[in-house]
Regions:
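Conserved alpha-helix/loop element of class I SAM-dependent methyltransferases that forms part
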Residues: 21-40
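Conserved Class I S-adenosyl-L-methionine
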Residues: 49, 174-260
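N-terminal, positively charged/glycine-rich alpha-helical extensions of SAM-dependent methyltransferases
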Residues: 1-14
Length: 260
């Protein structure tokens, strides 16, 4: 199912580019401060439409980006027209032939969890020089923002999507655990270091519905249930929240240095 779901993002690349948020600028400052300043060579896995890639390129990194979806890769190419130091490859990281020259950084923003868990850490190590950094960004929806809305929206998810865990509630950032298990289990990386960033994004009704249609869980719903869910959420925002809600995010940068 994961292999199938990771392909749904390519179905509507323009919506993805329009609706998905970017990343806190401090992520890229902390990456540089960790020993990987520009013009380091970066391999970005799953760049999508280039949300993080643009920020890296603007800082002077030399980037090879690999993207599974052809439509997403084409959108990224358009977004990065002014950055000749970026090369975009269409394909899967698992099957791509690594170049002979290793990279200084392997970077993945909200994409590493889509890579085969059996090989993603070891293959990232293969792509890096000794001392190079594996930098992954995870994005979490956390407690905060328009909390009353999200509690009500949860009931709509439970009604229309049977995959929804019952009584699911948003957690504060402090309750989200660091995910270092796969790094700790590898003998090729040192201990993981974590940096966290909380931030808010405001959405109108149409903007939020657009965002929901970029999520794999929403896109994979049967069409009648998907339409009913989106209609219900749209009415909820319009009628109870004046057509605008705020969502709180936690972005987490995980850094691990290759040691062998």
């Amino acid at each position: 199912m994961t292999t199938e779901l990771r392909r749904v993002f390519d179905e509507d690349a323009e919506r993805y580019d329009r609706a998905r948020p970017g990343y806190p600028p401090q992520i890229f400052e902390d990456l540089a401060a960790a020993g990987a300043p520009p013009p380091a060579r970066v391999l970005e896995i799953g760049l999508g439409t280039g949300k993080a890639t643009v920020s890296l390129a603007e800082r002077g990194y030399r980037i090879t980006g690999i993207e599974l979806g052809a439509s997403l890769a084409a959108a990224a190419q358009r977004n990065l027209t002014d950055h000749p130091a970026v090369t975009i490859v269409t394909g899967s990281f698992e099957e791509w032939t690594l170049p002979e020259e290793p990279f200084d950084v392997v970077f993945a923003a909200t994409s590493f969890h889509w890579i085969d868990p059996a090989t993603r850490v070891s293959r990232s190590a293969d792509a890096l020089r000794i001392g190079g950094l594996l930098a992954t960004v995870a994005t979490h929806h956390i407690k905060g923002g328009t909390e009353v809305f999200f509690a009500a929206a949860q009931r709509l998810y439970e009604r229309y999507d049977p995959r929804t865990p019952p009584n699911l509630r948003l957690e504060p950032a402090r309750d989200i655990p660091h995910d270092d298990a796969e790094i700790a289990a590898s003998d090729r990386f040192g201990p993981a270091d974590f940096h966290r960033y909380e931030w808010d994004a405001a959405y109108t009704t149409s903007e939020y519905l657009d965002l929901l249609l970029t999520y794999s869980t929403t896109r994979s719903m049967p069409r009648p249930e998907q339409s009913a869910l989106l209609d219900g959420i749209g009415r909820l925002i319009d009628e109870e929240h004046g057509g605008r809600i705020v969502k709180r995010y936690l972005s987490e940068l995980r850094l691990a240095r290759r040691i062998r």
